[in-house]
């Protein structure tokens, strides 16, 4: 691992990064999205799922496509799809300890809502360890990897991208960050949409476990 002494800030994507069981949580969100689309557009669940998937791949979030093509109220959408059961998530003491011992500014950087991110980190028992959250509303609904999203995030957090490390499970979302000088970290996964572009040079590190990686950073910076 290269020298990371210049790193002062760390960005965490939320879903799929702060917890491992993506299906248990985001699987619920996905089903709620399908139901929302079916209800709003008066289509069957199969057609709704097709639109959801198509918009996600074309516009980086299903919400973005729904706003463009169907003038969906984003706040109504976010409130509905994030009303889920998080009892499947347990407190993560290992992650908590590593976050506590890592002397860096810590931020959540998500394409979801602030409320959803707050619910996740509260369920994990790490809600008091983050300096701030940047969500899709802060991004004016420009989803990652839209350059506007990154510009707005940097302005809100008032951080230097060259002093920042960013952990993400969707590889393509790291591309713009790398151009800005951010140290990029891809959390390895087998989701097709997650690993697309994972072979590109804009990824500095590929990791299998967030807590272990944070421990490595801590040990490196204290050496």
Mark where each language-model region is.
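Proline-centered loop/turn at the N-terminus of a beta-strand
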Residues: 105-107, 183
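Conserved phosphate-coupling serine/threonine residues in phosphotransfer and NTP-handling enzymes
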Residues: 110-112
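Asp-based, Mg2+/Mn2+-dependent phosphohydrolase catalytic module
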Residues: 1-7, 100, 114, 118-223
């Amino acid at each position: 691992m290269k020298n990371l002494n210049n790193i002062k800030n760390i960005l965490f994507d939320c879903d799929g990064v702060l917890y491992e069981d993506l299906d248990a949580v985001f699987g619920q969100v996905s089903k709620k999205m399908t139901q929302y689309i079916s209800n709003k557009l008066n289509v069957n669940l199969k057609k709704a799922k097709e639109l959801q998937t198509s918009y996600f791949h074309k516009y980086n979030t299903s919400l973005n496509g729904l706003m463009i093509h169907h003038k969906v109220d984003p706040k109504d959408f976010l409130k509905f799809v994030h009303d889920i059961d998080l009892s499947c998530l347990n407190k993560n003491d290992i992650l908590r300890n590593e976050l506590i011992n890592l002397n860096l500014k810590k931020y959540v950087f998500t394409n979801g809502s602030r409320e959803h991110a707050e619910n996740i980190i509260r369920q994990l028992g790490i809600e008091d360890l983050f300096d701030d959250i940047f969500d899709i509303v802060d991004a004016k609904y420009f989803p990652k990897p839209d350059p506007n999203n990154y510009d707005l995030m940097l302005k809100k957090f008032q951080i230097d991208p060259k002093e920042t490390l960013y952990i993400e499970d969707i590889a393509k979302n790291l591309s713009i960050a790398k151009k800005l000088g951010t140290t990029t970290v891809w959390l390895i996964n087998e989701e097709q949409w997650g690993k697309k572009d994972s072979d590109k040079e804009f990824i500095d590190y590929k990791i299998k476990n967030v807590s272990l990686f944070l421990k490595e950073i801590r040990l490196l910076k204290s050496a």
